[in-house]
Amino acid sequence: MQRVALRAARSEDLEFLRRVHEAAMRPHVERAFGSWDADEQRRRFSESTDPTSHEIVSLDGAPVGCQWVRVHADALELVRLYLLPEAQGRGVGSQLVAQLCARADRARVPIRLRVLALNPARRLYQRHGFCVTGETETHVLMERVAASR
């Protein structure tokens, strides 16, 4: 099995985070909205991103993505889980989601997330027990209830 590891992101990781964001999200944004405005995406990403809130995902020692989990008193929120295309479809996302599910189960809290409706990652979340709890014009809201002990 491939070794997936996480480390805390640092401010100097911002450019890597931007690159992962574009590589992971551009195809889905183009399908959902018709185009990718690079300047607008860069601006919005920079305004909404504190690198130190993220973790860098590594596969066999090489950085391949990032995740951002926001901790609330009553839930975990998976804000971002981005993988470079070469890491997609290799079980990395599934390992990360399984780890997050175990963490939520230990804390006895649900996990909530929002995903573009057209993003195939939606199936990954469904395989891990997430259910649709709402929809917007472009996104699906999902939640996984903590497993009972």
Regions found by a protein language model. Give the residues of each.
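A short beta-loop-alpha structural element at the N-terminal edge
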Residues: 4-19
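Conserved GNAT-fold acetyl-CoA-binding loop/helix
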Residues: 22-47
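A short helix-loop-beta-strand connector motif used in the catalytic cores of GNAT acetyltransferases and
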Residues: 46-56, 65
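Conserved beta-strand in the GNAT
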Residues: 62-70, 77-82
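A short, internal acetyl-CoA/4′-phosphopantetheine-binding micro-motif in the GNAT/acyltransferase core
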Residues: 81-88, 115
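Conserved acetyl-CoA-binding loop-helix of GNAT-fold acetyltransferases
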Residues: 89-102, 122-127
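Conserved GNAT acetyl-CoA-binding A-motif
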Residues: 104-116
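Conserved acetyl-CoA-binding loop of GNAT-fold acetyltransferases
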Residues: 126-135
